[in-house]
Amino acid sequence: MIKITFPNTSARNYAIGTTPMQIAESISCRLAEEILSANVNGEMWDLSRPINENASVKLYKWEDFEGKRTFWHSSAHLLAESLQELYPNIHFGMGPAIENGFYYDVDLGDGVVIKDVDLVTIEKKMQELASKKLSISRQNVTKQNALELFGKKGETYKIELISKLEDGKITVYTQGNFTDLCRGPHLPNTSYIKAIKLTSVARAYWKGDESRKQLTRIYGISFPKKEELSEYLALMEKAKKRDHRRIGKEMELFTFSHKVGRGLPLWLPKGTQLRLRLEDFLKRIQKKYGYQQVITPHIGNKTLYIASGHYAKYGKDSFQPIHTPELGEEFLLKPMNCPHHCEIYKAFLRSYKELPLRLAEFGTVYRYERSGELQGLTRVRGFTQDDAHIFCSPEQVKEELIKVIDIVRVIFCALNFNDYEVQISLRDLNNRIKYIGSEENWKNSEGAIIEVCQEKKIKAKIKLGEAAFYGPKLDFMVKDALGRNWQLGTIQVDYNLPERFELEYVGADNQKHRPVMIHRAPFGSMERFVAVMIEHTGGKFPLWLVSDQVVILPVSENYNQYAEEIAKEFHKRDIRVTIDKRNEKVGRKIRDNELKKIPYLLIIGEKERRNSEISVRKHGKENIGIMKVTEFAEFLKKEVERQMSQWQ
C-alpha cells in the first residue's frame, strides 16, 4: 500500500500503482468527471499514470490554472493531428498552452498558405477527431528511439529538440495517428474537448530566431462546454472595444518598433507623463511608510544571478550574456532587482536599530519571452517593476505585512480597482523538506499572513502547497470591468535570498542574526498595470492621473490666440491642457478628441472670446454649458482635490 496525502493534510492508503483518476473515483463520481490532471510530489501527472510510492497529490479541475493548461495543451495536439490529416506534407515545430488558449507552429512546405478562411475547415476536423474519444497515451522512450521515430517522419524540428534532451527523460504522447514529443500531462482522451475556436493565423520564426525559417502559427482556444465558448466570444467582442493596444494608440501613450525589437515598448510623451504620475503617486505613498529610493544598473555580472538562484530559474528566459573581451566576464540583462538590493543591504554592517530597512526602485528588468507569447504591454521583454524589498527581523514581519497591505489597498482605491480577491499561498505540510528556513520562522510568517488578513477583514483563499520554496506569499487578484481576473499586487516573504547572500544584522544581544526579506510590487510591472488599467477603465482615467485634462477646440484658426491665452492661464494653475489647432471642422475635432479620452473639451468661438468664456463639454456627454475661464479652472481644481482626497 502507498499513502496519498491531500492538500488539506488528510491522507488515505491506496494500492501501489493507483492512478490519480482512481483516487478521484474513490472520493466521488463527480470529482472523477471534473478532474483534468494532477500534481504528484510537485510533478505534473497524467490521470492514467500510476503512482508507485507515498505521495502528496493535488487534483486539478477546469477552474484551476493548471487544469486549463492541461486542457489547452491537449487541444494543441488535437490541432496538430487535424493539420496532419489535412496537410500530409506538414512538419511540426512546437505547440504549447499559453495564457489564454494554445498555438502550434508548423511548416506547411513551400507555397502552402493557411488563411483565416481555412480555419473553419480545420475547426471542423478538430471537432470530428474530438468526438471520436481518441485515447491519449504516454510513453517513455530512449533518445535513440525518439531520434529514429521522428527521423522516419522527416520531423527535422523535433530532431533538433531531441538532440538537446537528456536521455532517460524523454516522453512521447500518442492519440489516433498522431505522435508528438512532449512532457505532458494530457487529458485522458479527446472527448473532453467540446468547443473549439481557432482565433488567428500568424508567422513566427522557429525558436524566435530571425535567422531561422518562418513557420505558420495557428492560435486557438477551447472549452469543456459549448456555452463557455459562446460566453468567451461575447466577452472578446467587448474586450476588442477596450483593447489597450488600440486605445493606447488612440490616446498616443505608447508604440512598438520592429527596428527596436519585439516586446520592447516605446513610451510616447503622453504615456511617459502617465507613467511618471503613477510613479510619483506611489513614491509619495511609500515616503509616508519610510521607503528609501535606490537605483541599480540594467545589467549585472552573471555570478550575481547564479548566487541568487535566478540564473537557474530564468537562465533559459534570459538574453544571451554580454562578454567583456579584456577580462572575459559575463554580464546579463537584469532579470530581477532583488539581488542588487541584497548587495545594497550588504554594503554596510547593519544594526537591529536600522530595521526594517525598506528599499524601493522602479527597476527595469528583461526576460526573453517567446514571440508567440508577446502581447501588447501585458507580455513584454523589457518591463519596469515597482519593486521594493523590506529587510526586517522575524518579529517585525507581521507589522510590515500590515503596512504593505495598506499600500496596496490605497492604490486599488485610488485607481478604482474595488473588486479583488486575495490568495494566501502556504507550505505543503506533507513535503516540508523542499522548503528553506526554520520551522519556527515558517510558522510565524504563515501565521502572520493569516492574522493580518483576519485583522484587516480580508476574506482570503488559502492555497496549501502553493508557497514558494523560500516563503509564503499573498496575491491580489483584481477583477476588471469585463470580469477578467488579473494578478496585480504580490507580497512575498523570503528566507532564501538572505541565506544565499549571507545577510546579517547585529541584534540587541550583540550577536549576528539573519534578516527576513519581504518582496512587494503593488503594480507588478508598470507596463502590465497600465494595460490592465486601460482595459478596466476603457481609457477613462481619473482626472488627477490623465495626461491631458483639457483640450481647447477653436472653431477656426481665428481663435487660436484666445486658445493660447486660456492655456497660459491653465498652466499657471497646473491644469494639463492641449490645443487642437488643426484646420478641421469642430465636429471632427470633437470626435477625434473623444477617442483620446480627454475628460473635458472646451469649444471657443466669437461669442466665447467676446465674453471671456468657454463652452464646456465633458467626455462622452453633452455640453455642460458656458463658463468663465476662472470658474472652470476652480471647478476642475475641486474635482481633482475630491478624487485625490480619497487616498491622500
Swiss-Prot record:
The keyword tRNA-binding applies. Its cofactor is Zn(2+). CDD domains: TGS_ThrRS, ThrRS_anticodon, ThrRS_core. Zn(2+) binds at residues 338, 389, 519. It is an enzyme of class 6 (ligase). One of its GO terms (cellular component) is cytoplasm. NCBIfam families: thrS (TIGR00418). This is Threonine--tRNA ligase. The gene is thrS.
